[in-house]
Regions:
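ABC ATPase NBD coupling module
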Residues: 18-35, 61, 68, 182-187
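Conserved ABC ATPase signature
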Residues: 92-96, 100
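A short, proline-enriched helix->beta-strand linker immediately N-terminal to the Walker B motif
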Residues: 111-115
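Conserved ABC ATPase "signature" region
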Residues: 17, 63, 69-87, 196-197
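Hydrophobic anchor residue at the start of the ABC signature
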Residues: 106, 134
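ABC ATPase "signature
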Residues: 174-178, 186
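A short, surface-exposed alpha-helical micro-motif characterized by mixed small hydrophobic
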Residues: 159-161
Length: 201
């Protein structure tokens, strides 16, 4: 999403190289289509902002609410969508658990109606008891809203559970790619084999 510029290669979205986007309007349109859920739900939410302002940031930037009432309604609906209570909107991030904070991060990503969401290790910082809940929420949202995820993870059992296609990367290089079943059952690269052999039985 151009938080960093690439040093080599291309990143294509809808057939366009995003590293060549120059105008502010084009970048804003791209960022409406592509959102991100960050790994650390503690560091990725501004501790000085209330939840309603965190979630509504994208709504405000893109002019998606015409009145304060419409803004509030959108935020409340997003909170309900991710399993939180609208009354939580006036609280600060420190008042929530890790799992709840990650739900706030998911609501923030959904606020601009994206088509593609990058999930950067979205459950690795959470308690094991909460991880499945967040993954189930992501899967439900995918079905309901027709979302596409790029799910970055090192937990291969979770990757198999959530993925249609898997790409195995090492040192910045894509080693192999295929359907979830193909990579798990017929992965040919030695690095893939070493990852698969490390999964607990």
């Amino acid at each position: 999403i151009r938080l960093y510029d690439p040093t080599a290669g291309e990143i294509l979205f809808d057939g366009k190289d995003i590293s060549k986007i120059k105008s502010k309007a084009d970048m804003q349109a791209f960022r409406r289509d592509v959102q991100m859920i960050f790994q650390d739900p503690y560091a990725s939410l501004n501790p000085r902002m209330k939840v309603n302002d965190i979630i509504a940031e994208g709504i405000d930037v893109n002019g998606l609410a015409k009145t304060p009432k419409e803004r509030e309604e959108k935020v409340n609906e997003l909170l309900k969508t991710v399993g939180l209570n609208p009354s939580h909107s006036t609280r600060y991030p420190h008042e929530f658990s890790g799992g709840q904070r990650q739900r706030i991060g998911i609501a923030r990503a959904l606020a601009v109606n994206p088509r593609f969401i990058i999930c950067d290790e979205p459950i690795s910082a959470l308690d094991v008891s909460i991880q499945a809940q967040v993954v189930n929420l992501l899967q439900d949202l995918q079905k309901e809203q027709g979302l596409t995820y790029l799910f970055i993870a090192h937990d291969l059992s979770m990757v198999k559970h959530i993925s249609d296609r898997i790409g195995v990367m090492h040192s910045g290089k894509l080693l192999e790619m295929g359907t979830s079943d193909d990579v798990y059952n017929f992965g040919v690269h030695p690095y893939t084999e070493s990852l698969l052999s490390a999964i607990p039985l």
